[in-house]
């Protein structure tokens, strides 16, 4: 499954859109912030799977029920957005 399909099939869109900030940051902003960062795909995959807090303000991102492979696919797709 590709990243766009996973984005639609998982609860990502409850808080994120590609272009605009909602509860969470716009995915294009995430891509821009992480452009050129070493191992950004692995770091982002960990945030997707395990949740994170404090990177984009006070609202935490909850853990998501995804496999390691799905998290990495989603992360690589997010980072590809321009």
Curated annotation (Swiss-Prot):
Stored InterPro entries: Cyt_c-like_dom, Cyt_c-like_dom_sf, Cyt_c_ID
Molecular functions per Gene Ontology: electron transfer activity; heme binding; iron ion binding
Record PTM text: Binds 1 heme c group covalently per subunit.
Entry keyword set: Electron transport, Heme, Iron, Metal-binding, Transport
Matching Pfam families: Cytochrom_C
Coiled-coil region: none
Residues noted as binding heme c in the record, renumbered to the chain: 12, 15-16, 61
Effect of residue 1 to D: In strain: 181, 217, 191 and 204
Residue ranges of the TM segments: none
Functional description taken from the UniProt entry: This is a prokaryotic monoheme cytochrome, unreactive with mitochondrial cytochrome C oxidase or reductase. It functions in nitrite and nitrate respiration in Pseudomonas, but it is also found in other bacteria.
Name under which the protein is recorded: Cytochrome c-551
Protein source organism: Pseudomonas fluorescens biotype C
């Amino acid at each position: 499954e590709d990243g766009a399909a996973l984005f639609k099939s998982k609860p990502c869109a409850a808080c994120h859109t590609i272009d605009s900030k909602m509860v969470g940051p716009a995915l294009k902003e995430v891509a821009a912030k992480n452009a050129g960062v070493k191992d950004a795909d692995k770091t982002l995959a960990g945030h997707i799977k395990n949740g994170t807090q404090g990177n984009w303000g006070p609202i935490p991102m909850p853990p998501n029920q995804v496999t390691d492979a799905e998290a990495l696919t989603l992360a690589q797709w997010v980072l590809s957005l321009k």
